[in-house]
Amino acid sequence: MSKNLFVGVDGKARKAKEFYVGVDGKARKIAKAYIGDENGKARLFWEKENTPVDYLEFVSNNSFTMSAPKLWDGTLEYNNGNDNGWTTWDGSEISSNVIDGRQRIYFRGSRNTVIRGNSASYSNPWKITGSNIECNGNIECLLDYQKVVAGEHPSMGRNCFKFMFRECSSLITAPQLPATTLAYGCYSYMFQFCSSITTAPALPATTLAEECYHYMFAKCSSLTSIPELPATTLAKDCYAAMFDDCISITIAPVLPATTLAEGCYTMMLAGTSITTAPALPVTTLVKWCYADMFWNCASLTQAPALPATTLVYGCYQNMFHNCSSLTIAPELPATTLADYCYDGMFSDCSSLTTAPALPITTLAEGCYKDMFSGCDSLTTAPVLPATTLAKKCYYRMFSGCDSLTTLPELPATTLADYCYQGMFGFCSFTTAPQLPATILAKGCYKEMFYYHQKLVIPPVLPATTLAESCYEGMFNQCYNIKPLALPATVLANNCYKDMFRYTFIDLSSTQSEEYPTPYRVPITGEGTDATDALSNMFDANGELFTGTPVINTTYYLKKGISIIS
């Protein structure tokens, strides 16, 4: 049976280039024609080869309805086989009808540059009510189908398809997205929460735009694979959260890009089930480029090599947060740090037992902030050789590391604001490292050992030049801590506030056989007070005295409590 139609022209059989049938008195062009054979079955006997499809099709075995907010800037038409042909659509609800044995609605557009655009909201995507609905064809047919037929790519405007199918759980197949040059936010949130889509469409674009794929497939819980991503030059936030919480994805994509952009991979694979991270060979980093990239990847066991030697702001921030199966951290060869570069990098990696070496002596603001917080299997801390610190450099660095037994020496003598704040909170070692600095900085030791219930021997505190909040809450809820001799005579605002709050340092205002040992602030000499310097220093501690002591006033420690000096 021939699959081409021949007609007689000038007495010769010529292959037909087009085929038309009469419908309602009008000639309609078709792509395929069927005829009944001798057994009563329909056989294809003519097919127009390479006929471009000029519509986007929604099809299901079951009836469905569609509606949408009218945000397009040209014209959209639909055809649902109701004998009206192509009808201009205003977004009001339309129903599918049986066409070629299945329920279908076709759409096409003219002179559109956006379908959703800047007025799009997550709360008003296209509404598709039904089940097991496929979307077939080229999405560009909604922009300008005539250009698609002509082999062109219609131009996309800002946020062109943003939020379009968000939360459409009945959609099982995504349309083709053949554009090669993208626009700002064009596919942002397009399929977020589409829980029935299993395969993503090809994404051939090589010229990306800011936020072009931002949250595109986030929370698509049935999505199992990631398409090739051929772009080598990235754009700001282009892949940010693209596959966030796609829990069925187990294999990471190849990332061929050689030129990164701000936030380009932020949260890209967060919450997926990948076991091995993709290679990340680029050595020229940009702000937040890998931030949160593998956040909550609980199955990740192998981290990529990170060869960059010069870091930038937040480049690895929270990169492996809560990767609970990660046991070995990658080497960190960087020689130049940047603000918040390693902030939270391995936080809550509960299987990590050994930290990477951190030999750099020139620090940056927040560089190691929260780096290992919550790593409750970590037993040995890295050497920290810096003698001059930076603001928040060690902030909460080992907070919650309750298996930590080998501590770093802390040789720094030049401190910075909040440099050690919360560094060892919620830990379990019994003896603290020494703190040799004599000139302090604002909040430098604030809450450093907060809720450290096993700490017995605190560090000697030789500083005589204090700063605002320098020791605030330092041993708060360290139940077994011993009191310290505090030599500074000139106090600072909030300097000892909450310092020994909720400990068992039991004081009395009067000396007795039960309370024999004198204790005062300062330990010797006459002190000069400051605003709230001693506020709640011993709050909720003993039965006879609790709360705020008075400077230069002698109190008495309960028998058996000795002073560390």
Named regions from a protein language model:
Residues 1-60, 64, 556-565:
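Enriched but not universal
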Residues 53, 60-99, 541:
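Non-cytosolic beta-sandwich-type ligand-binding/adhesion modules
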Residues 5-8, 18-22, 32-36, 71-88, ...:
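Short beta-strand segments and strand-loop junctions that repeat across beta-rich extracellular domains
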Residues 5-7, 18-20, 33-34, 161, ...:
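Periodically patterned hydrophobic/aromatic "hotspot" residues that form packing/interaction faces
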Residues 55-58, 90-97, 105, 115-157, ...:
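Structural signature of tandem-repeat unit edges
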Residues 8-11, 22-25, 36-37, 185, ...:
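Small-residue-biased low-complexity repeat regions
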Residues 109-113:
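Surface-exposed loop/turn motifs at beta-strand-loop junctions within extracellular Ig-like
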